[in-house]
Amino acid sequence: MAAFAAYERALVANDVAALDRFFLASPTTIRYGVAENLYGHAEIAAFRAARSPQGLARTLERTVITTFGRDFAIAATLFRRATAPGKLGRQMQSWVRTADGWRVAAAHVSIVEEPRAT
């Protein structure tokens, strides 16, 4: 999904205006982050505007995009950051196609300790 790749580029570049456009402009849009629970596009935009642009580079792993029909998709990925050794990030997004293009309607981001190899 091209929109997911474009979102990722905007995220690591801290392109706040683009990130704001990627989230559905609705009071029902939700983003559960590592340390914040954001309800509505306005809260998500305020979080993005205040966030430090440092340390956003990351490497994606095991990205899976599953579509349901032509207008709904789930994007799930793992990520790692050089600034957080021993940690594994997880991100899941619900995408909906609107008249303006694909938008994130709900997102969840969490970070866990790196699983030990067995």
Located regions from the model:
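Short, surface-exposed beta-strand-loop junctions and turns on beta-sheet-rich folds
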Residues: 38, 81-82, 110-111
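Hydrophobic pocket/interface hotspot
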Residues: 7, 19-20, 40, 44, ...
